[in-house]
Amino acid sequence: MTDKRKDGSGKLLYCSFCGKSQHEVRKLIAGPSVYICDECVDLCNDIIREEIKEVAPHRERSALPTPHEIRHHLDDYVIGQEKAKKVLAVAVYNHYKRLRNGDTNNGIELGKSNILLIGPTGSGKTLLAETLARFLDVPFTMADATTLTEAGYVGEDVENIIQKLLQKCDYDVQKAQRGIVYIDEIDKISRKSDNPSITRDVSGEGVQQALLKLIEGTVAAVPPQGGRKHPQQEFLQVDTSKILFICGGAFAGLDKVIEQRTETNRGIGFSATVKGSSEKVTKGELLAQVEPEDLIKFGLIPEFIGRLPVVATLNELSEEALIQILHEPKNALTKQYQALFNLEGVELEFRDEALTAIAKKAMARKTGARGLRSIVEGALLETMYELPSQDSVEKVVIDEAVIAGQSEPLLIYGKHEAQQASGE
């Protein structure tokens, strides 16, 4: 049977690239004396996409943001913590400048600037690390130090961290080597006592020892996709000296260690400096005075502290800062819920007294910014449950009484009738 063209000729048409006839493909696109099928078009698109992927890292390297630009971007998403943002901006800039220009400059070897973030729960440590990675468009992964153990023990090996990073970038080693790793709860792997113990501390000092080489820089052999189930597969070699490690922790009790040191240095007897009650130093001010010896006394081993040369301290968030966090950043919590309600065609309004009540509640719980979402979620739960079943609601108003649990959110209907969510 002969294929017929629309112009009436009996010539069978073939793709000029793969040679398939017009009956073997879905579409054959004609050009001047040539034809290309839909399959070859798809293949060309794949080739172009791969080329773009390879070119992208070079483009990024040529446009490294300055510390000012990094700090400015952090300001859009993180409220307060000005000193910490400045320290991070400089450290991150220097790290990627080192990668871009090679580890040496005129024969001088440039050291690696891993970062230690010290601050209470909910002060923004994780958010800072996530925002940095997103801005720089580099792979990012998080690990919880409390789940890590030495190799050979029940728990997560430290090298699993690199495996997670590889998973985030589809096992592209070059891309992973430009990534950021955030290790949370690093204070929880402190040594149980000041003196090294004869018994093995596999989740404390043992983990610190295991992390040493990884953080400083080593070539880690990581199993490819499929892991240890396929031992015949060749391991991927990842150079961790190019990965930026950021460690964070609350370090509860560290302020007491610092206070003890500063009190001792102040002297005793007639030469002692007497401090009045009005001169009482805050916890944040104490943490800002942290020295390596304080961290050693807290339980981190000297070698581990040496691998984290850049230290930034974060202050406990005040009530005013929590109110700002609720509505000022680009992805502020209230803006997120307003966008969610907007998908239902409903306007969501948070009154000023409601924001204050949310902040007060979070302060009472001592959870910092981390506790804000659960408070808002609790206040809006019933409304979010009922709203998709109601067609005429135009606006939902949240006030102080709603946050306190004394009343339901105010629902404003299309006919401009205000009713309580309870159905009054």
UniProtKB/Swiss-Prot annotation:
Gene Ontology cellular-component terms listed: HslUV protease complex
GO MF annotation: an example: ATP hydrolysis activity
SMART domains: AAA, ClpB_D2-small, zf-C4_ClpX
Binding site for Zn(2+): 15, 18, 37, 40
Xref: SUPFAM superfamilies: Glucocorticoid receptor-like (DNA-binding domain), P-loop containing nucleoside triphosphate hydrolases
Keyword field contains Nucleotide-binding: yes
Free-text function comment from the UniProt entry: ATP-dependent specificity component of the Clp protease. It directs the protease to specific substrates. Can perform chaperone functions in the absence of ClpP.
Subunit structure: Component of the ClpX-ClpP complex. Forms a hexameric ring that, in the presence of ATP, binds to fourteen ClpP subunits assembled into a disk-like structure with a central cavity, resembling the structure of eukaryotic proteasomes.
Protein family membership: Belongs to the ClpX chaperone family.
Name under which the protein is recorded: ATP-dependent Clp protease ATP-binding subunit ClpX
Natural source organism: Sodalis glossinidius (strain morsitans)
Gene name of the record: clpX
